[in-house]
Each structure stands twice: as C-alpha cells, then as structure tokens.
C-alpha cells in the first residue's frame, strides 16, 4: 500500500487542504474496520487486519501536512517535533493496551474480552481524535 500511496499522493495532495480533505474522507474507513474487528473478535481474520493496516495509510498524510503548514524555516523543527510526538504516542498507546489487557484478565475477563477492551480503547481514542480534528478544521475553513 505504501508503494501505491507513494505514487498517488503527489497527484492527489498538492497542498495542506488536499491532505485534510483526503484525511477527512479516509480516516473513518479505518475506524469502521477496527469496529468490525472488535465486533468479530476471534472470528476476525488476517484479511480484516490487513484491511485495517492498509486503511491506516490515510493517517500518513498528516506528516506532510504538518511540514506544509509551516514556513520553510520552521518546517524542519515542526517535523522533528511531530516525529517525537508520534514516537512517544506509539509507545504510550502500546503500554496502555498492555495495561488494559492485564487489568481485564485480573478481573477474570477472558483473554479475548480483555483484548476487545484494549481495542475498544484504541477505537474510542481514535474516534475522539478524529472528531477533534473535524472540529478544529471546521473552525479554520
């Protein structure tokens, strides 16, 4: 998907507004697939997870949009800060997922339900972030 994305993004996304439009349209697809995976539980197969991963590609539009939102003088600093934020956020989310699974199991929930709780946390935080994004861009445009 990254190979195709690398080919098509320059054709679709020429500025920040294009990236925001694509993100606005594409991000819900990822959330819908994650909700389906949570609903299916152990019946969700590798095809569902592959679709989830491929649909996450829309989130990669954020980084170039951050770079384009700043002047050339400040673009490098903004991208470095953004990369640090992504790095810290990824580890934080992984840590929280593990804690939720451990807590679920300590309350005698099954391993499957504990994983569902953790993925539900990811869905809720992702949906909250997406709604916050929509609220902010509607104020800007």
What kind of feature is each model-predicted range?
Residues 63-64, 97:
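Interfacial helix-capping/hinge residues at the ends of transmembrane alpha-helices
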């Amino acid at each position: 998907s990254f190979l195709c994305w690398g080919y098509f993004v320059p054709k679709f996304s020429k500025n920040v507004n294009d990236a925001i439009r694509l993100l606005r349209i594409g991000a819900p697809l990822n959330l819908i697939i994650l909700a389906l995976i949570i609903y299916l539980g152990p019946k969700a197969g590798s095809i569902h997870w592959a679709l989830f991963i491929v649909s996450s590609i829309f989130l990669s539009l954020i980084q170039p949009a951050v770079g384009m939102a700043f002047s050339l003088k400040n673009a490098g600093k903004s991208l470095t800060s953004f990369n640090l934020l992504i790095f810290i956020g990824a580890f934080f989310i992984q840590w929280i997922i593990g804690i939720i699974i451990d807590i679920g199991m300590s309350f005698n929930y099954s391993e499957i339900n504990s994983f569902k709780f953790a993925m539900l946390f990811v869905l809720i935080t992702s949906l909250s972030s997406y709604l916050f994004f929509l609220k902010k861009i509607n104020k800007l445009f």
